[in-house]
């Protein structure tokens, strides 16, 4: 396994194992009717903030993505310490806290949710008041032109999840995201079936290549899937996990 700059194999594998253990714990302890939503926020310094929310029959998210400096204060320079793992803050551009840009701004957000979620509203706000214009969001969705509101994630012809991805205007230094939905059929839904978030991960092969004049220091090359069904980002041509095209 090649090193990401400033990150040893041992550090990376240790973080991978902790994440995998946590996911397996959550997955194995899931109850019927679970609803899963994963939110990825991509920052201008290369940081990725990942938030997962599970609930019974309904899901409600109200998260504010702020400059990551608030999470870094008082922390050690260890690239992937337990605090960061627990807070779901990762530095795929090297992991060195000294490389962190205090003026980091969210540049894009991706939402992946299971088909058991009937999403009613997705609202964005600048600060706590101004909403992102609908026409801007429509321009940000490469699949909007086809009339599909969300990109469908399929496995063996069956829809196993949906992806909602958009970039943010350059002046946004914080973003509030609210997602609400209800379970479509709680009486028959079974997390042990193909309709679970682990299968969603195994099925998504998203091209997240973007770079504009406001954010020229990072390019997300591809979305990779690990053998353990945890999605990794291929940053600056450092590949981890297994691309779907190479899966057996």
UniProtKB/Swiss-Prot annotation:
Where this protein primarily resides, as one coarse class? host cell
| Function per UniProt | Major component of the virus occlusion bodies, which are large proteinaceous structures (polyhedra), that protect the virus from the outside environment for extended periods until they are ingested by insect larvae.
The positions making up the signal sequence are 1-27
**Can you say what this protein is called?**
Polyhedrin
Glycosylation sites per record: 28, 77, 86, 237
What keywords tag this UniProt record?
Glycoprotein, Host cytoplasm, Late protein, Signal, Viral occlusion body
Q: What else is known?
A: The sequence of strain H is shown.
Report the InterPro entries cross-referenced here.
Answer: Cypo_polyhedrin_Cypovirus1
Can you say where in the cell this protein is located? Host cytoplasm
Q: Which Pfam families does UniProt cross-reference here?
A: Cypo_polyhedrin
- List GO terms (cellular component aspect): host cell cytoplasm; viral occlusion body
């Amino acid at each position: 396994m090649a090193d990401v700059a400033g990150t040893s194999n041992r550090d990376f594998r240790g973080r991978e194992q902790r994440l995998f253990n946590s996911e397996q714990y959550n997955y194995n302890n899931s109850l019927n009717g679970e609803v899963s939503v994963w939110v990825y926020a991509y920052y201008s310094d290369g940081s990725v903030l990942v938030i997962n929310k599970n609930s019974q029959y309904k899901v409600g998210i109200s998260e504010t993505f702020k400059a990551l400096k608030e999470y870094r204060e008082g922390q050690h320079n260890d690239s992937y310490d337990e605090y960061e793992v627990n807070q779901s803050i990762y530095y795929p551009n090297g992991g060195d806290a000294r490389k962190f840009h205090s003026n980091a701004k969210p540049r894009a957000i991706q939402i992946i949710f299971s088909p058991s979620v009937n999403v009613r509203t997705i609202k964005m706000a600048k600060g706590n008041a101004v909403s992102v214009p609908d026409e801007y969001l429509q321009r940000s969705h490469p699949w909007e032109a086809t009339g599909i509101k969300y990109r469908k994630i399929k496995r063996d012809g069956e829809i196993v999840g949906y992806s909602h991805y958009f970039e943010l205007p350059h002046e946004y230094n914080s973003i509030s995201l609210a997602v609400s939905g209800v379970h479509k059929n709680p009486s028959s839904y079974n997390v042990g079936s193909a309709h679970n978030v682990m299968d969603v991960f195994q099925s998504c092969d998203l091209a997240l290549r973007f770079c504009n004049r406001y954010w020229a220091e990072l390019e997300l090359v591809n979305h990779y899937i690990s053998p353990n069904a945890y999605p990794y980002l291929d940053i600056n041509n450092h590949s981890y996990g297994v691309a779907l095209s190479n899966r057996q």
